[in-house]
Regions:
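Metal-coordinating catalytic core of metallo-dependent amide/deamination hydrolases
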Residues: 1-112
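Active-site-adjacent C-terminal substructures of enzyme catalytic domains
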Residues: 101, 111-228, 240-247, 253, ...
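Short, charged, solvent-exposed linker or helix-capping segments at domain edges/interfaces
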Residues: 46, 249-251, 272-273
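Loop/turn positions that initiate beta-strands
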Residues: 232-235
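Alpha-helical structural signal
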Residues: 54, 58, 194, 213-216, ...
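Short peripheral tails and domain-boundary helices/loops at the edges of structured domains
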Residues: 256-273
Length: 273
């Protein structure tokens, strides 16, 4: 599970959110990755001086985040009316100097060059991609950055869905995530996300399984320990109810067909058979 900050919009509240995430990481059995979403939205008091807000987050808050070990990644919302490619690059470059890799939000509404910049800077993932050009796909093919689709966000906002079929047919991998947040995707239901991927994004059931497991693990840099049932990896997995086929798992959208949740070999949901 990845948990992002980004809703504090000032030093005290961003650090508070990240400290809460750090505590959850220590107390919860599920693997948690924390992301400092430094450039998420522009506070009203910085409406006409965005550069000052970027300077605050990059040059004042980020060093404290790094010093206290509060983030596994940084993130920015690179979009018209929010943060520019140059501002995103400023954050990524500063974080790299402090040993923190990046994950970024790009191409949700407009194509402004964020994908190319993120791939050149070895971002771990690029999230959204509802708008995607052939040039963006070619850039992604040359890099090691995971495209991530967020279909529940498209559903809630009634915007186009990430062209997953186009991405896969181009020879690229794709991951799926809920984008669970109060503004654009108020649902953490991964079952629904997977069904949307099949229904709205024309993904095949086996592609959805791969996107929501191993590729999702890669997007969080835990693919060596999680994401597949493999010798040497942690025994964290789900067991479904009896099904006639893999497709049935996503066909009955809104249904929970998970019988057991196992985390590192221990059943945390469901009963032992």
């Amino acid at each position: 599970v990845e948990i992002k900050s980004g809703y504090g919009l000032d030093e005290a509240n961003e650090l508070k959110m990240l400290r809460v995430i750090k505590r959850l990481k220590a107390e919860h059995p599920v693997e948690i990755k924390s992301t400092f979403l430094a450039l998420h939205a522009i506070p009203l008091e910085y409406k006409n001086r965005v550069e000052d807000f970027v300077d605050l987050m990059v040059n004042k808050v980020l060093p404290k985040v790094a010093a206290d070990g509060l983030a596994d990644f940084v993130d920015a919302f690179c979009e018209e009316g929010y943060f520019s490619v140059a501002q995103m690059n400023q954050l990524i470059d500063a974080a790299k100097e402090l040993g923190i890799p990046a994950k970024v939000h790009v191409n949700q509404f407009n194509v402004i060059g964020g994908v190319e910049a993120a791939v050149k800077r070895n971002a771990r993932s690029v999230d959204h991609l509802e708008e995607l050009t052939e040039e963006d796909s070619n850039v992604l093919l040359e890099g090691n950055t995971m495209p991530v689709a967020l279909p529940a966000c498209s559903f809630f906002l009634r915007i186009p869905y990430t062209p997953a079929r186009k991405i896969i047919d181009a020879g690229l991998p794709i991951a799926l995530a809920t984008d669970f947040n109060p503004g654009s995707s108020p649902s953490g239901n991964m079952n629904f996300v997977n069904s949307l991927a099949c229904i709205q994004q024309r993904m095949l059931p086996n592609e959805v399984v791969n996107a929501s497991t191993l590729n999702g693990a890669f997007a969080m840099d835990v693919q060596d320990a999680l994401g597949s049932i493999t010798v040497g990896k942690k025994a964290s997995l789900i067991v479904t109810k009896p099904l006639n086929s893999l497709a049935e798992l996503f066909y009955y959208f809104g249904e929970n067909n998970i019988d057991q949740v196992i985390v590192e070999g221990k059943i945390v949901e469901g009963k032992a058979n």
